[in-house]
């Protein structure tokens, strides 16, 4: 009899434990659902804040572009390009400095085997039919043609959008105040915050946003101001000097001096590291 009572007690105890475990499980599931809802809400808030930030950046860029246009109308030129050639001795720029510049500043075409379909400057917008300033270079190419990074950089913006103006949009932040952006893409090959090297595939040509056909809208900016991309697209080691006279608004002399100092410091550091090795081998 005592054994039966003992067994019944154990069963009762185990049943209570099961009920308690089930209750705990339901509680944890409810907490998990609540946390999932919180995470989803935070993600939605993050997307909203990112979108708002990008909208404000675009408005700031528009204001900057309008100021630049006004300066051109008024004849204001703070780049002092007229005396640049006399101050900048391009022949004295070493091969090391040239390689640094060509790795860090956008150059070459971001799309191979493409056709330049619309240049930088005032034009009639093919979608709206209105006259407006086109702040980039368009490249016509088949859908899913690879887009390459024109210089080392970090992915600053990745914004998916199939219907809004720029469509699927990506922006790279390069060195020395330069940035490049890519609109109407079909898909991305990189994520925000990712570092890329010159020549890496960053995405593919598409027809997203306000677009009349598959193409890439390519922009280059310096400290937020748009520049004509064509001189950069045509720039390379064989015509290295041309960029300094074709692109205004950049203090090239100051930039090159900065790079020369960096390269010199790196060479000195390399020499110091090599000195003990040479001494030990003698």
Predicted regions and their residues:
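Non-catalytic extracellular/periplasmic "stalk"
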Residues: 3, 7-115, 119, 242, ...
């Amino acid at each position: 009899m005592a054994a039966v009572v003992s067994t019944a007690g154990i069963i009762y105890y185990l049943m209570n434990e099961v009920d308690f475990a089930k209750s705990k499980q339901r509680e944890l599931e409810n907490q998990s659902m609540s946390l999932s809802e919180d995470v989803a809400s935070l993600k939605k808030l993050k997307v909203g804040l990112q979108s708002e930030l990008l909208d404000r950046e675009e408005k700031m860029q528009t204001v900057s572009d309008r100021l630049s246009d006004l300066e051109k109308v008024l004849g204001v030129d703070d780049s002092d390009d007229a005396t640049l050639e006399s101050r900048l001795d391009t022949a004295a720029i070493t091969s090391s400095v040239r390689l640094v510049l060509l790795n860090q500043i956008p150059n070459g075409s971001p799309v191979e085997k493409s056709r330049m379909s619309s240049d930088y400057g005032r034009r009639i917008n093919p979608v709206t039919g209105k006259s407006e300033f086109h702040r980039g270079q368009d490249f016509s190419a088949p859908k899913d043609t690879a887009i390459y990074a024109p210089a080392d950089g970090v992915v600053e913006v990745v914004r998916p959008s199939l219907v809004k103006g720029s469509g699927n949009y990506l922006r790279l932040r390069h060195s020395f105040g330069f940035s490049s952006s890519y609109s109407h893409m079909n898909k991305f090959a990189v994520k925000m915050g990712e570092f890329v090297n010159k020549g890496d595939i960053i995405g593919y040509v598409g027809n997203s946003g306000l677009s009349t056909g598959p193409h890439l809208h390519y922009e280059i900016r310096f400290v937020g101001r748009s520049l004509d991309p064509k001189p950069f697209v045509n720039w390379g080691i064989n015509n290295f000097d041309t960029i300094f006279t074709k692109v205004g608004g950049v203090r090239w002399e100051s930039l090159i001096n900065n790079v020369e100092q960096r390269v010199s410091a790196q060479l000195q550091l390399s020499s110091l590291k090599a000195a003990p090795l040479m001494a030990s081998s003698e």
